[in-house]
């Protein structure tokens, strides 16, 4: 498949044109024209690029790519090394950010809901779905369930939350700023990847459970699901590689 055809295929699947983002979605660094072997991962880190070189990949597809708004345009240090690896080995780099958060099937939010057994009921606002657990559970039990499913112990604040949790809202990655919207909407718990100092005060003062389950851990699902979709619907050879990250 041509590199531009792959870009078009995924753009159409994720409906990228309909979503305003703060990073370019699609082909970010051009490599060889023909793509057959692909490595995927959450972030285009040097470790992931090194794995792509080792495996002889023609392309790398990630959720967190390069060239973010506000990023310095200077190419030196870490950025230079990453780009050098891609260009020297003629490897294409693709990134899909918010489109891979929002997709109702392959998206990070949809995948996290499926992993945790949450029935999606609707959206509080874009990128912030809400839903219900199959049965109400105590806050500590939900923390243990999240740890078992994600392989990472979440930071949990349940100081003033209800005795049991059933109605939840979530936003994968760095979605902690949405906790106030979730509280106003009326949920028992809010799940995201990261935590800020003020997030804990918001949880305590608005009476809901809060779980920070890891930016990386909550966003493995989307890129893994996209990898599986490509393997099932094309003749491409796609390998998802999880580079460990406790954050």
From Swiss-Prot:
Indicate which residues the UniProt annotation says bind a divalent metal cation 2.
64, 215, 219
Annotated GO biological process: DNA repair; protein hexamerization; response to ionizing radiation
* A GO molecular-function annotation: identical protein binding
Gene3D superfamilies for this protein: NIF3 (NGG1p interacting factor 3)-like
Annotated a divalent metal cation 1 binding sites: 63, 101, 219
> Does DNA damage appear among the keywords?
yes
Record keywords, A-Z: DNA damage, DNA repair, Metal-binding
Signal peptide boundaries: none
GO CC, one annotated term: cytoplasm
Q: What happens when the gene is disrupted?
A: Cells lacking this gene show a 2-3 orders of magnitude drop in survival after exposure to ionizing radiation as compared to a wild-type strain.
Name the protein family.
Belongs to the GTP cyclohydrolase I type 2/NIF3 family.
Its biological purpose is as follows: Provides significant protection from radiation damage and may be involved in the degradation of radiation-damaged nucleotides.
Subunit (UniProt): Toroid-shaped homohexamer. In the hexamer, 3 dimers assemble to form a ring-like structure surrounding a central hole.
**Protein name in the entry:** GTP cyclohydrolase 1 type 2 homolog
Q: Which organism is it from?
A: Escherichia coli (strain K12)
